[in-house]
Swiss-Prot record:
Assembly and interaction partners: Part of the 30S ribosomal subunit.
Organism: Methanococcus maripaludis (strain DSM 14266 / JCM 13030 / NBRC 101832 / S2 / LL)
PROSITE patterns: RIBOSOMAL_S14
Residues of the signal peptide: none
Name assigned to this protein: Small ribosomal subunit protein uS14
General function of this protein: Binds 16S rRNA, required for the assembly of 30S particles.
Keywords: Metal-binding, Ribonucleoprotein, Ribosomal protein, RNA-binding, rRNA-binding, Zinc
Keyword Zinc among record annotations: yes
Gene Ontology BP, a term: cytoplasmic translation
Cofactor list: Zn(2+)
Homology family: Belongs to the universal ribosomal protein uS14 family. Zinc-binding uS14 subfamily.
Superkingdom of origin: Archaea
């Protein structure tokens, strides 16, 4: 009998990037983005975010 992997319902492991599927603490969920920080940096200009000095 093998163990079946269970789906995490809460915590950092339950949040995934909707673009690349990466898990962990680098997920940006504000405004319903659900992107990891690397994907967010690539898409931010297209989404209308501006980088200020």
């Amino acid at each position: 009998m093998t163990k079946t992997p269970f789906k995490t319902k809460y915590g950092q492991g339950s949040k995934v990037c909707k673009r690349c599927g990466r898990k962990g603490p680098g997920i940006i969920r504000k405004y319903g983005l659900n992107l990891c920080r690397q994907c967010f940096r690539e898409l931010a200009p297209k989404l209308g975010f501006k980088k200020y000095d």
